[in-house]
A protein has these predicted regions:
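A short aromatic-anchored loop/beta-hairpin motif
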Residues: 3-117
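Arginine residue identity/basic-tract feature
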Residues: 11, 45-46, 136, 153, ...
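Glycine-centered flexibility sites
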Residues: 30-32, 130, 164
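Long, well-ordered alpha-helical scaffolding segments within enzyme catalytic domains
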Residues: 46-53, 158-167
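Internal, conserved structured core segments that host functional sites
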Residues: 107-160
Length: 167
C-alpha cells in the first residue's frame, strides 16, 4: 500500500472503506494436501464458496501452523513473498505465486493489540502454503491485504487461546 506511511494517512484511507457493522467470522480451515492449492477439489470449491458466503474483509489475518517461532511474529511488509515450504510435489505447485499485499500499519496495530504476547514485526517470512493454498481460492484476485501471525513454540494452549480472544 503505497502512500500510507503514517497513522493519519491510514485513518484517511480507512475512512473511505465500507464500514464493518459486524465482527468478521473466525474460520478454522485446514489445507489438507498442498495440491488443493492448484487442483479443483471439493475442498478448493468449498473455499471459493465460503468467500461468497461471508462479507468481504478489508484484510485477512492468518495464524499458520507452518510458522513456529521463538516468540510471536507478524508479517509486516508491503508485499509478502509466496513461500513454497514443502517438497516432493510437481513443479506446477512451486510455480504458484500469490501476490497479495501486506499492510505494515495494520501489522503494527495488531501487534499493539496483542501487546501481552510481545508480538514482533517480521519483514522476512511471507505467506506459507498453510495460507496461500486456501486464500488463493477464496480471494483469487489477491487484492486483499494478508497478514500472517506465527505460533510461539513456547506458548501454552491457554496463552494461544487468550491471543485468539483479543479484538
Amino acid at each position: 500500500m503505497t502512500g500510507i506511511d503514517t497513522l493519519s494517512s491510514f485513518r484517511h484511507f480507512t475512512d473511505g472503506l465500507a464500514p464493518q457493522e459486524h465482527l468478521m467470522p473466525v474460520l478454522f480451515v485446514g489445507h489438507g494436501s498442498p495440491m488443493n492449492g492448484i487442483e479443483d477439489t471439493a475442498f478448493s470449491r468449498r473455499w471459493t464458496q465460503m468467500a461468497k458466503e461471508i462479507p468481504t474483509p478489508n484484510a485477512v489475518l492468518v495464524v499458520s501452523a507452518h510458522w513456529f517461532t521463538k516468540g510471536t511474529k507478524i508479517t509486516a511488509m508491503d508485499f509478502p513473498k509466496t513461500i513454497h515450504d514443502f517438497g516432493g510435489f510437481p513443479k506446477e505447485l512451486f510455480d504458484v505465486q500469490y501476490p497479495a499485499p501486506g499492510n505494515p500499519i495494520l501489522a503494527k496495530e495488531t501487534a499493539d493489540l496483542l501487546h501481552s504476547a510481545n508480538v514482533e514485526l517480521d519483514h522476512d517470512w511471507g505467506l506459507d502454503h498453510g495460507t496461500w493454498t486456501i486464500i488463493r481460492h477464496m480471494y483469487p484476485n489477491a487484492n486483499i491485504p494478508v497478514l500472517q501471525l506465527s505460533i510461539d513454540r513456547a506458548a501454552t494452549g491457554e496463552m494461544l487461546f487468550e491471543i485468539g480472544r483479543r479484538r
